[in-house]
Amino acid sequence: MGKKKQMRSEVKGNVKNSIGRIAFAALAVLLQIGWILILMIKLYQYSSVISLLTSLFALVVALRIYGKHTNAAFKMPWIIVILAFPVFGLCIYGLFGHKEAMHKIIRKFEDVDAQLIPLNVQDETILQQLEQEDPLLANQCHYIWKYGNYPVYDTTAVKFYPEAYLGYEEQLKELEKARHFIFLEYHAIEEAEAFARLKDVLAKKAAEGVEVRILYDDVGCIGFLDKSFIDRMNAIGVQCRVFNYVVPFLNIFMNNRDHRKIMVIDGKVGFTGGYNLADEYFNITHPYGYWKDTGVKLTGRAVQNFTMMFLEMWNVMGQADTHYEKYLKASQEGAEDGNVQKASGYVQPYADSPLDGEPVGENVYLNLIKTAKKRLYVATPYLIISDEMTRELGLAAKRGVAVRVITPGIPDKKIIYGVTRSYYSGLVRQGVRVYEYTPGFLHAKQMLCDGDTATVGTINMDYRSLYHHFENGVWMHGCDAIRDIEADFDKLLQDSEEVTDKYRDGRKNMAVRGWQCIMRLIAPLL
C-alpha cells in the first residue's frame, strides 16, 4: 500500500512538472506569434502600398498552394484563411504550413536513411512467389517496398492479441528472454503501475549486460513524465532519448509527433499495436469506460523492419550509431527457429513519415479498400478522412462489398468525436454500415479485407495520423493470426451498436451541422 501511495505521489509530481514545462513553452510561442502579428498589422496599417503588396502576395501564395500536388483537403483551409485575413494567414502559413522550413530536420532523416536503406534488402523471390499467387497483393507489397523501403517476408510468425493487457503480458515474458538488446519506441509512457513492472524487467536485463534503449515522444508524455525520468532510467542502465522536445521557440516540426509503438527484443521478436505504456490502455484506470486495444507479436526475419524503424528515429534524435551489423544480424538469425520456418503467409511491417511527401499509411488502407471483393472491416478511434477515402469506402459498398466501420461509443475527445460523427452520413448513404463500440473507447487501429489480408498498427483514420505523425503498422496476408483478427471483429460488432439508420438522413440541427462543417474545414491543419 505504501509503495502504491508513493507511486501516486510521484505521478502527480510528474504531471505537475511536465504540464508546467509545456505551458511555459506554449505561452512563449504564443507571445512570439503575437509579436509577429502585431508588427505585421502595424506595417499593414501604416501604408496603403504595404497593404496592397501584402494582399497581392497573399494572392500569389494562395495560387501557389492551389498548384501544389497535395491533398485538396489541405489546400482549401489555407487558401481561405490567407485570402480572408492576409496578414494573419501569411504569418500562420509561414510558421506552420510551409514544409520547406523543415529542411534541416528533413536532411537529418535523409542522411540516416542513406545509411540504413541499403541494408534492408528485398528478397525478390518472395515478390515473384506472391505475384504468381495474387498479382494485386503483390502490387501492395511492391508499393510498400518501393515507397516505404520495407521488405515483405514469408518466414515470420504472427500472434494477434485482442486485448492490450494480453500483449503486454507477452511482452514481459519475452523481455525476460532478452540476451543482446531491447529497443522501445512509444508515443506515451506513464511512470505508474503498468510501467513499474516493465521497468523492473528492464533494470534486471540491463544489469545482466543487455543493451536497453527507450525513445518516447515529448508531447505524448505530457502529464506522464518529467525531465528527471531520463536520469532515473540512466541510473538503472537504460539509455533514453526524447523525440522532438517541446521548446519555447517557434518550430514547425513541433506539429509532427512520434506516434509509433514498437518493441524489439534481440532483433528476433517484435511487438506493435495501438496501445502505449500507460495505465489507461490496460484498464488499470477507466477514464472512458472500457479501453479496447489490440496488438501483434512478430517472430522472425520481418522484425528487422522494426529494428530499422527504431534505429532511424534514435539516430535522428541524437548521436548516430552506425554499427548496425550486430542488430541486423540478430534479426536474420531469428529465422533459424524451426517454428518460424513453418510460419504461414506474408508479413510486411511498414512505417510512415510526414516529411517525405508519401502517405504510405493512407495508401495501405486505400489499397486494401480498392481490392476488397466480399467484406471489409475497419476499426478506428477517429474517423476524419479525405474525400478520396470516403469515396473508396463508398465505392466498395456500392460494388457489393460488406463494409463495416467501427468507432468508439465513449470518446476521449468530445470535439473530435463530433467531427468523427459528421462523416457517418456521407458513408451510410453509400451503403457503408457504421457501428459504435458501446462498452467504452475503441482505440484499436486495424483493417481486415476478405478474411485473408489485414493491417494492424498505430495509424488512426484521421489527418494527424495519415499526414502529420510518424506511424507504423504491419501488413499481413494468409497468416494464422488473421483468423484471430476476424474473430476480434466479430466480437467487436456484437459489442457495438449500429448507428447506420440514425445517420442516413444527416443531422437536422443546423447549429450542429454548421459547427461540424467548420471543424471539418480546419481538421487537416490540426
For each feature predicted by the language model, list its residue ranges:
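A short, conserved beta-strand element enriched in hydrophobic/aromatic residues
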Residues: D293, A379-T380
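Short, solvent-exposed amphipathic alpha-helical segments in soluble enzyme
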Residues: E392-A396, S422, D490-K491
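Helical hairpin unit composed of two closely spaced alpha helices linked by a short loop
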Residues: Y382-V403, P408, K413
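N-terminal localization/anchoring segments of enzymes in phospholipid and broader phosphate metabolism
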Residues: M1-N363, N367, T371, P411, ...
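C-terminal structural cap/anchor segments
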Residues: V401-V405, I410-D462, L466-Y467
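A general structural signal for well-ordered alpha-helical packing
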Residues: E362, I369, T390, V403, ...
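Glycine- and other small-residue-rich loops at beta-strand/loop junctions that grip anionic moieties
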Residues: H187, P381-Y382, I416
